[in-house]
UniProtKB/Swiss-Prot annotation:
Enzyme Commission code(s) on record: 5.3.1.1
Active site residues of this protein: H99, E169
Record gene name: tpiA
Pathway: Carbohydrate biosynthesis; gluconeogenesis; Carbohydrate degradation; glycolysis; D-glyceraldehyde 3-phosphate from glycerone phosphate: step 1/1
Family of this protein: Belongs to the triosephosphate isomerase family.
Record's protein name: Triosephosphate isomerase
Length: 254
């Protein structure tokens, strides 16, 4: 972690969760400070169908809510899409943009991700901008060049430490149980900090860099001890309060 940066533990429920799942949110909200301490932030990005209810449940807790995607436009004939303003209207404070599953399933390019980040800012949301290399790119030794290209294309010039969070998610590690080595994560996050510094100047010094990719209670302590890893973007492990809080505990006192 970076000593001067307040860590963020973010959960991404993806396409999981119905009303019966809301009890897990209550447990996360009530247990977060005890687990992570008062010096960390938490957010759960739920499906749009749960967002308003999740926001009500977490309203008096230190855990915020977020969306998982937004359309660049404020409104219009975009059936099935959700504007950032609509997420904010449901109580969201954050929104994930550019997740690898969106890039793959919906063929989103870097410029699409940048437009969504700007839409998030317009609505007063913090954008969690996701980047990361595929297995083929990794095996070809292209990890750092891919990250440079995605920082250049996916992070708009107006990004600040307040309106943006960067999440590094090696695509090959998501949902597979595989994680890069400590050395690989450290190298990637140091590279991201340097690239952001060249693009954004001093703002990059305070920007939170999250690691995402099969984060679980058993590896959270090691991952969150790495310099420039300022929190985590958690997938499956965020669906259960016990797992999310166990991961959150890894930042306590750091």
């Amino acid at each position: 972690m970076t000593p001067t940066i307040r860590p963020l533990i973010a959960g991404n429920w993806k396409m999981h969760g119905t009303e019966s799942s809301l009890g897990e949110l209550k447990a996360i909200g009530s247990g977060f400070v005890e687990a992570a301490g008062a010096g960390a932030d938490g957010v759960i990005c739920v499906p749009a169908t749960l967002l308003a209810r999740a926001s009500d449940i977490l309203a008096k807790t230190p855990v915020a809510t977020g969306g998982q995607d937004c359309h660049p436009a404020t409104s219009g004939a975009h059936t099935g899409d959700i504007a950032a303003e609509m997420l904010a209207d449901c109580g969201a404070s954050y929104v994930i943009v550019g997740h690898s599953e969106r890039r793959t399933d919906h063929h989103e390019a870097d410029e699409d991700v940048a437009a969504k980040a700007e839409a998030a800012w317009r609505a007063g949301l913090t954008a969690i901008i996701c980047i990361g290399e595929t297995k083929i790119q990794r095996e070809a030794g292209e990890t750092l060049s891919v990250l440079s290209r995605q920082i250049a294309g996916s992070v708009p010039p107006g990004a600040t430490a307040k309106n943006s969070v960067i999440a590094y998610e090696p695509v090959w590690a998501i949902g597979t149980g595989l994680t890069p080595t400590v050395e690989d994560v450290a190298q990637a996050h140091a590279h991201l900090r340097a690239e952001l510094g060249m693009k954004l100047g001093i703002e990059a010094d305070g920007m939170r860099l999250l690691y995402g990719g099969s984060v679980k209670p058993s590896n959270a302590g090691e991952l969150l001890s790495i310099l420039n890893v300022d929190g985590a973007l958690i997938g499956g492990a965020s669906l259960k309060a016990a797992d999310f809080l166990a991961i959150s505990a890894a930042v306590k006192g750091k």
